[in-house]
Regions:
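Periplasmic/extracellular loop-to-transmembrane helix junction in inner-membrane transport proteins
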Residues: 1-29, 169-180
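Loop-to-helix entry region at the N-terminal start of transmembrane alpha-helices
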Residues: 16-24, 73-94, 182-186
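Generic alpha-helical transmembrane segments of integral inner-membrane proteins
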Residues: 22, 26, 30-38, 42, ...
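Transmembrane alpha-helices
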Residues: 26, 89, 121-154, 201
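Cytoplasmic-entry segments and transmembrane alpha-helices of multi-pass inner-membrane transporters
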Residues: 39-72, 87, 97-105
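Non-cytoplasmic
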Residues: 87, 140-195, 199
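C-terminal transmembrane helix and the adjacent membrane-cytosol boundary/short C-terminal tail
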Residues: 101-104, 108, 184-215
Length: 215
């Protein structure tokens, strides 16, 4: 059968895999964003702490995704847990780096003005610094999401959810009549999801970033 016939015959399974793939990436991005922004908030005032945070999260990205998942399997088993841990760790670097850069880039005069009207440090952070640092943080989230879309496909190695299962099934059956269709379906599905997520981030940016500070 040709590719379109294959999509029609497998559309329910493909939609299920696509939903699981998108859900895994979304949930891991939420966790990575919370952790990454927290690390940025804790470390941005100190040069050495910021460098340490960036270096540590950069080091994680040097570990091949298959190796990372392989190391996690004996600890947390197969399925969702190694997928969630690996994706969350891989998603940290762009968020941590951009959170630090964004917070350090806030105009000190604005912080001084907030202090002058009686704002406490936590209030300054929440009401002045984080909103002004939001554009680079959102950019970091977008970059992380695009990275995780591809890395999530490797989760099929650990029986994880997502479109990677379709790709791995095709690779395992190379030479069969549907092998290429399986690989193409999984790959194109991931590309479509990545584009949809990026479009959503553009919309979020339009809605949450004041026009005066848009980059």
């Amino acid at each position: 059968m040709n590719f379109w016939e294959y999509l029609h015959s497998r559309h329910q399974q493909l939609l299920s895999d696509a939903y699981q793939h998108a859900s895994a990436v979304f949930q891991c991005m939420v966790v990575a964003t919370l952790i990454g922004v927290l690390i940025g908030v804790v470390t941005y005032r100190s040069e050495w702490a910021g460098n340490l945070a960036t270096t540590a999260t950069s080091t994680i990205l040097t570990i091949p995704s298959l190796a990372m998942i392989g190391l996690l399997i004996p600890i947390v088993g197969l399925g969702v847990p190694p997928t969630v841990i690996a994706l969350t760790l891989y998603g940290l670097l762009p968020i941590v780096r951009n959170a630090i850069v964004g917070l350090r880039g806030v105009d000190p005069s604005l912080v001084d003005a907030a202090t002058g009207i009686g704002m406490s440090r936590p209030m300054r952070l929440v009401r002045v610094e984080l909103p002004l640092a939001w554009p680079p943080i959102l950019t970091g989230i977008r970059v992380s999401t695009q990275m995780l879309m591809g890395i999530a496909a490797i989760a099929a190695y650990a029986s994880g959810p997502g479109l990677g299962n379709e790709i791995f099934r095709g690779i395992a059956s190379l030479g069969s009549k549907n092998a290429l269709n399986q690989v193409l379906a999984g790959t194109l599905g991931i590309i479509v999801l990545a584009l949809l997520f990026d479009a959503a981030y553009v919309l979020i940016g339009r809605l949450t970033i004041p026009r005066g500070i848009r980059v």
